[in-house]
Amino acid sequence: MAPPVRLAISLSYPYAPVPMSAPAAQPAPALADAVDAVRQRTDHTPELVLILGSGLGDLADEADAPTVVPADVIPNYPQSTVEGHHGQLVFGTLEGRSVVFVQGRVHAYEGYPTPRLTFPLELCHALGATRLLVTNSAGGINRTFQPGQLMFITDHLNMAFADPGQGQMASPRDTAARRDAHAATASPLHTGYYDLEWTRQAQHVGAEQGVLTVRGTYAWTRGPSYETRAEVRMLSTLGADAVGMSTVPEVLQAHALGMDVLGISTITNFAAGLGHEVLEHDDVLKVGQQVRGDLRTLVRAIVEKT
């Protein structure tokens, strides 16, 4: 009789443990080339990166002493093909803080693999940014939400079941070291992808400015088609309050890099089956433009006071 076969099952992370004293990750060649190209145009070192969603790109006009770096002069930088998304980085100050605005984010439905979606974020991090404020336009699933409201993201559903992996960093060990170092210093309120304390402060600041906000869970789908009625019912059952086609890849990568994350969705429309109108991208842009005053007020106050 053959001896029994014993199986060893590992429940650990897929990476070997990395000492906390491991050297800092160095950018991969593609990222290093992009950093060099930006540094030829500005020596600005941002503290905060703001990624702007559909119809919200003109928030970058709020930057003081701006330096604009077009996406097409940055090697390896993905180019957006979506109306309302003009690809460029805008460096400057906002309420006295050093910032960089990412205008013209790219989406999975434009044909980019998930790791490419996070290249602009990784570039900003390599230039010095340690905090991410990300905005998007989303369809409202929660029946108490109305178009034009602003929702702070407290969690997400990754319905694309995709992950940026290691992005453009040098090796899995480097990113694992960053993740482990961040986890070792994270507070109990910062064990998720979104900084709940930053969110609490931001919502308080919004109330002070007279900007009413809500909180909720954001569902990411690949697009480009809007969701069917059946899909919206499914997402509602799963706990989603809003749905959109962006944000989650950047948030996942920001977390891996140890960045603090604050997410804001502009509810631009009722999701399919909850309203009577046919969903069009132009409508998303229109509502985004209508609410940009509130969002501008909110973002400036958040940058100044949190």
What residue ranges belong to the model's regions?
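Zn-dependent metallopeptidase/amidohydrolase metal-coordination segment
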Residues: 245-283
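Metabolite-binding pocket within alpha/beta catalytic cores that recognizes anionic/polar moieties
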Residues: 21-190
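Generic non-transmembrane alpha-helical segments
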Residues: 37, 41, 197, 201-211, ...
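N-terminal amphipathic/basic-hydrophobic helices that include classical n-h-c signal peptides
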Residues: 1-19
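Active-site rim beta-loop-alpha module in soluble metabolic enzymes
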Residues: 192-234
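Non-catalytic positions within long, well-ordered alpha-helices that form the structural scaffold/packing
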Residues: 125-128, 236, 255
